[in-house]
């Protein structure tokens, strides 16, 4: 089980496959450095960054899926803990951000689907909806994508969102975390905070 979670009333969680840039995105959102690396699965426990006075925090949950040098049993345990964390804290989670590698996501999703498996990203997107947390998809590494609109349409299609992607701009956020280009995600988060009557949190995404 994950270590103790800080007792906060409001939270934004980052979820996604290993090595999609969640820790880099967490750094851009908080201004605080976290462990990052090219080796998938560096983050094994949640990273929390909180503001006690507002009872608010960002949480980077461990990556799921392939992790080099990590046994399948341990990967499954991490996934189980992620699911449990989201279930137990759904009432305080204002937004669940599913971070994807924009260049690789469609191929990975299609490869799993062809094997008859539910792709992890699609499963997590649906799971967040099931527990009452409206997901935001942060499509990262846009600097590596040739035709961004086409790729975002394809991702929407895989998630069951009817293209064009622009009509889902409150849920689909193209970003490039390593370049600090996260404005589309911040706009989505501002919308969520306002919907939850937490305009006091807008300063954290401005």
From Swiss-Prot:
Protein residues bound to Mg(2+): 23, 43
GO MF terms, alphabetically ordered: GTP binding; metal ion binding
Single GO biological process annotation from the record: cell division
Cofactor: Mg(2+)
EngB-type G domain span: 8-195
Top-rank taxon, per record: Archaea
Keyword Metal-binding: yes
Entries under Pfam families matching the protein: MMR_HSR1
UniProt-annotated binding residues for GTP: 16-23, 41-45, 60-63, 140-143, 175-177
Keyword Coiled coil: no
Alphabetic keyword roster: Cell cycle, Cell division, GTP-binding, Magnesium, Metal-binding, Nucleotide-binding, Septation
Functional note: Necessary for normal cell division and for the maintenance of normal septation.
Entry's family note: Belongs to the TRAFAC class TrmE-Era-EngA-EngB-Septin-like GTPase superfamily. EngB GTPase family.
Annotated protein name in UniProt: Probable GTP-binding protein EngB
Organism of this sequence: Halorubrum lacusprofundi (strain ATCC 49239 / DSM 5036 / JCM 8891 / ACAM 34)
Phylogenetic lineage: Archaea, Methanobacteriati, Methanobacteriota, Stenosarchaea group, Halobacteria
């Amino acid at each position: 089980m994950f270590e103790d979670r800080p007792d906060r009333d409001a939270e934004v969680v980052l979820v996604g496959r290993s090595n999609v840039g969640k820790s880099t995105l967490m750094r851009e959102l908080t201004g605080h450095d976290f462990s990052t690396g090219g080796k998938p699965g560096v983050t094994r426990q949640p990273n929390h960054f909180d503001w006690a006075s507002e009872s608010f925090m960002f949480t980077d949950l461990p990556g799921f899926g392939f992790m080099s040098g990590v046994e399948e049993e341990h990967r499954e345990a991490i996934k189980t803990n992620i699911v449990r964390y989201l279930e137990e804290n759904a009432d305080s989670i204002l937004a669940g951000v599913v971070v994807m590698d924009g260049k690789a996501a469609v191929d990975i999703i299609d490869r799993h689907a062809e094997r008859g498996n539910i792709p992890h990203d699609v499963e997590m997107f649906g799971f967040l909806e099931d527990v009452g947390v409206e997901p935001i998809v942060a499509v990262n590494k846009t600097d590596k994508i040739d035709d961004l609109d086409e790729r975002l349409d394809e991702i929407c299609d895989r998630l069951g969102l009817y293209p064009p992607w622009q009509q889902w701009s409150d849920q689909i956020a193209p970003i490039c975390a390593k370049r600090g280009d996260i404005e589309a995600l911040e706009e989505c988060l501002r919308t969520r905070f306002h919907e939850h009557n937490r305009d006091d949190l807008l300063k954290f995404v401005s």
